[in-house]
């Protein structure tokens, strides 16, 4: 069965909440031409209801506003209206304090919510999902009551996402300690965000809540028992979060081992409902039972994720982590590089000092680290539960 072609025959109606903010704008940009999803409703603050999107929004992305979005009306959020339009999937770019109330209500009304908000990330039955890192966590939606009920799936904090993508292939080496300093762009603070007087020609050495998020989320996503030490700084850059990372491992490791792990890992989703036979794994990873048990990774060396029509989900690159072999790279101005744009994590300056491995990484905080991550999560859901989504019957 050709999943991609079947889904494309009839696009799936979706809605975006918080559509006027920076992350909301990225959602609209990604969904306007998406091969699987039809943008059917957008919502902003109450004061903007029934107003035309193009007239109301200060567009801040480095790409033009999609014409299909420009003339859409911002609408109030009503459950009956969503149901009447056949909308089941909702992308949430709501502030955490609003999402804490709205998203559980949508779940109770049988909607499938893919959220960028942090409000529900730490609930035990709500996954923090990164398809190429922990796809097996999608099954948490069944703990929330799916298919009888709706669910909420979250993506990680933007800085966490980039680091988790880089560390995912390295779990087999048994990470003992993680030291990370982040240099985060102003777009991560939203719009209008920080005052120019605060940030221009300056750096702010503390971002409230950010360091705790990285610690908690990395441990949940990667199932790490490692000690994590994070320091987060805001810098006067528009897009892209740069991170410097030092790792200490349980066993001796060389930089060539790190490179091989990054280069050999591709995301190849399994067929519908067989996803949980394995996590995303490297094709050169053949662990012994002891190593697999210790790292929390699959012990069956043949349980590799198979190809879907020669490529991955529409929003995911075949190679999620790309190493740049030049001492001056990566840089934040490259955050929209790659294909799909903004969805690759770039690493560089890989080196060994004593018993520690160091490297630099760059993640696009708005695409990979926010809206693009949520869209990829929805794609993984559609692919995994395709039979149910088309027939309403569990396979």
Question: What do these predicted regions represent?
Answer:
Residues 187-395:
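Charged docking surfaces used in two-component/phosphorelay signaling
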Residues 2-200, 227, 273, 284-298, ...:
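N-terminal Rossmann-like NAD(P) cofactor-binding subdomain of oxidoreductases
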């Amino acid at each position: 069965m050709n999943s991609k072609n079947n889904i494309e025959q009839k696009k799936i109606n979706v809605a975006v909440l918080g559509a006027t903010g920076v992350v909301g704008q990225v959602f609209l940009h990604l969904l306007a031409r998406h091969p699987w999803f039809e943008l059917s409703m957008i919502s902003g603050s109450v004061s903007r209801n029934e107003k035309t999107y193009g007239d109301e929004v200060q567009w801040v992305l480095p790409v033009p506003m999609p014409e299909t979005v420009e003339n859409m009306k911002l609408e109030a959020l009503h459950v009956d209206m969503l149901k009447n339009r056949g909308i089941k999937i909702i992308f949430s770019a709501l502030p955490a304090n609003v999402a804490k109330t709205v998203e559980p209500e949508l779940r109770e009304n049988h909607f499938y919510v893919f959220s960028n908000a942090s409000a529900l990330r730490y609930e035990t039955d709500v996954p923090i999902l990164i398809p190429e890192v922990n796809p097996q966590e999608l099954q948490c939606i069944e703990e929330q009551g799916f298919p009888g009920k709706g669910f909420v799936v979250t993506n990680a904090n933007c800085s966490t996402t980039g680091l988790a993508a880089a560390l995912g292939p390295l779990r087999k080496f048994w990470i003992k300690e993680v030291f990370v300093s982040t240099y985060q762009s102003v777009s991560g603070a939203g719009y209008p965000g920080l005052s120019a007087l605060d940030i221009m020609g300056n750096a702010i050495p503390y971002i409230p809540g950010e360091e705790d998020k990285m610690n908690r989320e990395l441990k949940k996503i990667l199932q790490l028992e490692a000690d994590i030490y994070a320091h987060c700084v805001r810098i006067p850059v528009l897009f892209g979060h740069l991170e410097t990372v030092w790792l200490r491992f349980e066993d001796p490791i060389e930089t060539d081992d790190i490179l091989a792990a990054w280069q050999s890992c591709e995301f190849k989703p399994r067929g519908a409902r067989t996803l949980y036979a394995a996590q995303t794994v490297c094709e050169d990873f053949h662990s012994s039972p002891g190593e697999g048990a210790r790292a929390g990774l699959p012990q069956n060396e043949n349980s590799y994720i198979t190809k879907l029509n020669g490529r991955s989900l529409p929003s995911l690159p075949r190679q999620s982590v790309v190493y740049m072999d030049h001492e001056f790279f990566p840089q934040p101005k490259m955050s929209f590089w790659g294909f799909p744009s903004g969805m690759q994590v770039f690493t560089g300056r890989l080196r060994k000092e004593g018993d520690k491995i160091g490297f630099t990484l760059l993640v696009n905080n708005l695409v990979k680290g926010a809206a693009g991550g949520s869209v990829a999560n929805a794609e993984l859901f559609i692919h995994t539960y395709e039979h149910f989504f088309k027939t309403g019957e569990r396979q």
